[in-house]
């Protein structure tokens, strides 16, 4: 027998184990994008899924993690993605990092838009300088051409974000505006922004 853990603002309630089965039916929690018949690293697609689907609900997820800590869990069954049966501490730790808006890895994301290529040159030059100065991870994202969800994912993964853009009709370039709005909608915080 299972009973639901009420988590406000989650698409579906998570169900906590109450029997000997020790299964957490996690609804959208611990889900990920991708096919189940393809072996791949869980974290990348789960991170993208989290910040695309669940990310703005960090506080309710934190509350859920606290409630779930009172149960012995041997299996996590999300609606989307594989059933998790091994090294559950790894998955729970990542969810704790993501839902508390903590930095997962040190690194810099340079997100840019460029109309004539000059802002792109500046972004690439900055990436080169950062690498020369010893920054171990630098990711450069062209917001007009690269995957939007991956840009959001990287912004939440790393501790520093640099935004480089042009103006458009006396305003922020539309792709940059969409990116900033996407970060704001997901409660982006605890990062250094330049």
Residue ranges and their predicted role:
Residues 114-116, 167:
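Residue-level signal for short, function-critical loop segments
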Residues 77-104, 178-179:
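Short N-terminal or domain-adjacent regulatory/targeting segments
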Residues 119-123, 127, 176:
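Short, highly selective alpha-helical patches that border small-molecule cofactor pockets
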Residues 1-86:
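Metallo-beta-lactamase
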């Amino acid at each position: 027998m299972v009973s639901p853990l009420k988590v406000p603002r989650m698409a579906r309630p998570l169900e906590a184990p109450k029997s000997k089965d020790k299964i957490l039916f996690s609804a959208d929690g611990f889900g990920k994008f991708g096919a189940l018949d393809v072996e791949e690293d869980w974290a990348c697609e789960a991170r993208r899924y989290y910040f695309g689907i669940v990310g703005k609900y960090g506080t309710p997820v934190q509350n859920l993690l606290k409630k779930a800590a009172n149960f012995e869990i041997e299996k996590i069954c999300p609606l989307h993605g594989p059933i998790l049966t091994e090294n559950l501490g790894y998955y729970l730790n990542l969810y704790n990092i993501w839902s508390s808006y903590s930095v997962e890895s040190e690194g810099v994301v340079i997100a840019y838009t460029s109309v004539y290529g000059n802002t792109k040159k500046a972004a690439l030059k900055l990436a080169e300088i950062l690498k020369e100065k010893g920054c171990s991870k630098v990711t450069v994202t062209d917001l007009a051409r690269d995957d939007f969800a991956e840009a959001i994912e990287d912004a939440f993964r790393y501790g520093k974000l640099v935004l480089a853009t042009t103006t458009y009709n006396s305003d922020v370039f539309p792709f940059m505006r969409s990116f900033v709005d996407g970060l704001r909608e997901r409660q982006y915080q605890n990062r250094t922004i330049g």
